[in-house]
Amino acid sequence: MDGEGPVLGFREAGYLILASASGQALLDENLAVQRDEGVDTLRLDQAALSARFPWLNVADLAVGAFGARNEGWIDPYALLQGFRRKAVSLGADYREARVVGLKRAGARIIAVELESGDVLSCDTVVNAAGARAHQIAQMAGTDLPVRPRKRQIVSFECRATIPDCPLVFDPTGLYFRPEGAGFICGMSPKPEDDPDCLDFEMDHDLFERDLWPMLAHRVPAFEAIKAKGGWTGHYAFNVLDQNALLGYHDAYDNLVLANGFSGHGVQQSPAVGRAISELLIYGHYRTLDLARLGYQRVVQHQPLVERNIY
């Protein structure tokens, strides 16, 4: 606002994606795509990984892709509040209310019903309800392949120094990165252990049972660590292909989707916000053509599958 962006706490420590011999070909394919698009990503073989990150156990690794520039992490809540403040300054009206129904007339949604009893007439409805997107779709008498999936993050401390640690993605699905004076870590569960879920209960055995052994294997200094806390949240998980659903729903003239980001939401939110705004104002995308992410792929069952998911 007033020419100044929000303070996001960007830490440019890089992303390091690791691959064993079985994943080397796929990593190289993805690396080629990134380089074709001008991304400055380094390919590090086993010796280069060991030289650059001497605290890393590379015995079972073949290669790594390291983005040292323009990659890292931010404070997502600061980004959210920055979006909100800017929207309010431009005239947006935020209501803290629970939606309980959508009034329909033919191929249009004509009003939104709130738990308070208020009814808001509307020209267009944008479903951006995150992990509850499916519930909103049901109110419109339709469906979305988006379900709430719980994810857990654990914070831990390590007395040993781990210099220049990036965000590390392990072939096992484990990830970890520095956070404050310590670290945070997590991993996605196996599909059979990943039910639809909206509670915030912690699995207090997750760290010692699953995460700690993998951490200690990849970073020997993590043999001596201590869990400090953690939290849970929910992915808006697109069960079709784990990618966003954007644009108009086929069943309605005025229902727009911005759903199913499956963990990519913070990264993609600036581009998606612009794209949906263009769609509402001009009737089509202008900056980026995101039609391939439309609802038609659900109707036609044509998933757009990401081949390297973390």
What feature does the model see in each segment?
Residues F66-T124:
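Helical element adjacent to the flavin cofactor pocket in flavoenzyme catalytic cores
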Residues M1-R52, G173-Y175:
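Dinucleotide-binding Rossmann-like beta1-alpha1 core, especially the glycine-rich loop
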